[in-house]
Amino acid sequence: MAAPAVSGFSRQVRCFSTSVVRPFTKLVRPPVQIYGIEGRYATALYSAASKQNKLEQVEKELLRVAQLLKEPKMAASIMNPYIKRSIKVKSLNDMTTKEKFSPLTSNLMNLLAENGRLNNTPGVISAFSTIMSVHRGEVPCSVTTASPLDEATLSELKTVLQSFLSKNQILKLEVKTDPSIMGGMIIRIGEKYVDMSAKTKIQKLSRVMREVF
């Protein structure tokens, strides 16, 4: 039963890789469109995994692939452009068999190898993660402060930020510190950007003072 799905997935990725638009109507459309080669592979994978109800499984497997490719020995045998493609395919088959990856993930890696696109693997994984994040209703938000926030302030901040989201959206918060902003905070939520840092306020004040004097 798995062979037709894998074969279909192969055709989908090849069609996307050669910019053939017609098969797109057969795909399960992702919640967000990712452009470029990585986006095409990720979109085709999302469609195939969605049809088989294996989105979460494939996502976990891709994160594992990302970890494995950071290992020097694995990276040397797969990502090196001077190594023969047949050797890369064998290394990939050994890896996917050892890790017991699903046919979807295994086939993706083989396709990347066959098409000479293994260097695009990190980008494909990143694109798929982005699609899955939107699929879950996650809204990325980064908050930068000059010094770490205490628990009470952080909790209040989360409540305020969550209030700007709809009920089916999930806040995915990342808090960073950057002493150079001097105070206040910089917030980026979704496509919105708000700079309330002391550094920016001082710069604005400086410009106003120059105009006055």
Curated annotation (Swiss-Prot):
Modified residues (N6-succinyllysine): K90, K100, K158, K199
Keywords: Acetylation, ATP synthesis, Hydrogen ion transport, Ion transport, Membrane, Mitochondrion, Mitochondrion inner membrane, Transit peptide, Transport, Ubl conjugation
Motif SIFI-degron positions after renumbering to this chain: 5-23
Entry annotated with the keyword Isomerase: no
InterPro entries the UniProt entry points to: ATP_synth_OSCP/delta_N_sf, ATPase_OSCP/d_CS, ATPase_OSCP/dsu
Post-translational modification: In response to mitochondrial stress, the precursor protein is ubiquitinated by the SIFI complex in the cytoplasm before mitochondrial import, leading to its degradation. Within the SIFI complex, UBR4 initiates ubiquitin chain that are further elongated or branched by KCMF1.
Protein known as: ATP synthase peripheral stalk subunit OSCP, mitochondrial
Biological source species: Rhinolophus ferrumequinum
Gene: ATP5PO
